[in-house]
């Protein structure tokens, strides 16, 4: 009887929703290839097929840069309130939050997939040679420590933006809206030095 208030208080805190939670009622499907697995809600079927085509092209293109990404699971959260993504090494997956932006174009999904795939390529590139050897000693998350210590996040994101711009007809490097803030700052205040620019 004394445990009931305690148990009720725990159930209340379990109702907090974060990016990674989806409604329990969702039905999930998957597309599997030799290179990737896309896990998605059943109502997202048409776009999941589109994503599979995008990823197949990206995998083929990645070999031209000498990077051969290992198989990865792409988990699609199509029922949330954000458009974003992330890549994790443990467990190896990419999570895509695919709410279209307010001014969606027909390329918004291609843009998101391309950007996050570049992060997959980056982490696979870091996880080779000495880093890979040391990850057997220090664990699977060791490459993330290497990134955190030696590669600034602005470089990781800038590289992903440059990649999304270079591989197709999309990318923020082609978007006046994305470049306007930097152009205005340069015209009004000049080019900031490195220390000020990275703040």
Indicate where each model-derived feature is located:
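Bacterial N-terminal signal peptides
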Residues: 1-9
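Juxtacatalytic substrate-recognition/specificity segment
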Residues: 14-146, 152, 188, 195-196
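An active-site-proximal "capping" alpha-helix that borders the catalytic cofactor pocket
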Residues: 55-63, 155-168
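Catalytic Zn2+-binding segment of zinc metalloproteases
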Residues: 117-133, 159-176
């Amino acid at each position: 009887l004394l445990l009931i208030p305690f148990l009720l208080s725990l159930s209340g805190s379990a109702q907090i929703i974060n990016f990674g939670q989806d409604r329990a009622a969702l039905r999930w499907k998957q597309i599997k290839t030799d290179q990737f697995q896309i896990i998605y809600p059943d109502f997202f079927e048409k776009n999941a097929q589109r994503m599979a085509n995008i990823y197949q092209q990206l995998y083929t293109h990645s070999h031209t840069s000498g990077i051969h990404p290992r198989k990865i699971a792409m988990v699609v959260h199509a029922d949330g309130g954000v458009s974003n993504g992330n890549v994790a090494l443990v467990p190896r997956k990419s999570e895509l939050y695919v709410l279209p932006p307010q001014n969606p174009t027909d390329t918004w999904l291609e843009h998101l997939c391309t950007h996050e795939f570049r992060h997959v390529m980056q982490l696979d590139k870091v996880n080779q040679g000495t880093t890979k050897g040391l990850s057997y000693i220090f664990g699977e998350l060791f490459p993330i420590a290497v990134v955190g210590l030696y590669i600034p996040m602005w470089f990781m994101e800038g590289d992903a933006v440059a990649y999304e711009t270079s591989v197709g007809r999309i990318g923020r490097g082609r978007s006046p809206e994305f470049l306007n803030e930097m152009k205005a700052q340069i015209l009004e205040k000049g080019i900031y030095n490195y220390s000020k620019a990275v703040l």
